[in-house]
Amino acid sequence: MQIQENPGAVSRAAQERFGEAYSVLRQAIADHAFPGCAFGLLVNGSVLLHDSLGNFTYEPDAPRVNPDTLYDVASLTKAVATTSAAMLLYQRGLLDLDTRVGDLLPGFVIGRDPAEHARDVTVRHLLAHTSGLPGYKPLFHTAATPYAVLRGCLEMPLEALPGARAEYSDHGFILLGKALESITREYLAAWVMREVFTPLGMTASRYCPHPAIRAEIPPTEEDELFRQRRIQGEVQDEHAFLLKGAGGHAGLFSNVPDLLRFSQAILEPRPESLFQPETVELFATRQPPEGNSSALGWDTPSGASSAGQYFTPGSIGHLGYSGCSLWIDRRDNLAAVLLTNRTWPHRESQLIRSVRPAFHNALRKAL
């Protein structure tokens, strides 16, 4: 699906039209919310904004971010890669969303106390973050291999009955990725590259960037806890790192043009296109229980959402821990991408939380 793009620098008219959005981002850089960013806006199939600000780090001689800079998009992997794989497998009749996870991954139920009801956890629960699995446990403190990470997730005690509570869970998506691999019979990363990214023309998106291009990717962190070195051009997430750089929850590197191409496929699904309308509608629908903002693999606007005030009901989006976000408004036919390395040099800063809604509000007010 083609997107109209205007080659060359952003016009002065566009910079003036979206001046408030630029101001939000410039102030964020000045406040050290992040050292630089790339961003884009797609409306009715046309790219109205595709630009960048700032640098890779806060050092004066650091490389400048350009509009096509590749970023570690962290948990955007869950939506753009893993959920897309689930969508296609569902469309092709290869995945029933109500399949029990234990039927795909027997290690998830073997040896468990029946009172946990792990046998009742389904693929749908994993997508909706309602499996009962905890949100996050640092398995990397004791796990040193992909097998150890997977085993830690498989054996992790449930903290709620399946479907009873919503809790965003990395571990659930690690298991989801492995469950999908049991269907595709190949590594999820390779399958997604071939079946999702190649058809959509997402030529920059990849896992495990080649060492030759790592210097062209903004660093995410000076890691003093786990790897004891600068993390640049390799996945920041510790569990994804132990999973050879690619997990169902993290590992993807992408850029603004590719994420806008992906968004266009979501915004204008057709029977003959990659994503069919009925599939998009299903995966964009909020899931129980009451109060859960998650659809299937996607978040939806709720309360003080990172999407801001103007994304309409039916919009879907996702955040990445590294400082990235993608929001898609299906009613108003638009998508907004913001890519940053807000975790540089250390991950404690939470200033991005106020930047995201302010940026999205400024974009929407300019339309």
Roles of regions detected by a PLM:
Residues 314, 321-328:
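Short glycine-rich, acidic/polar surface loops and turns
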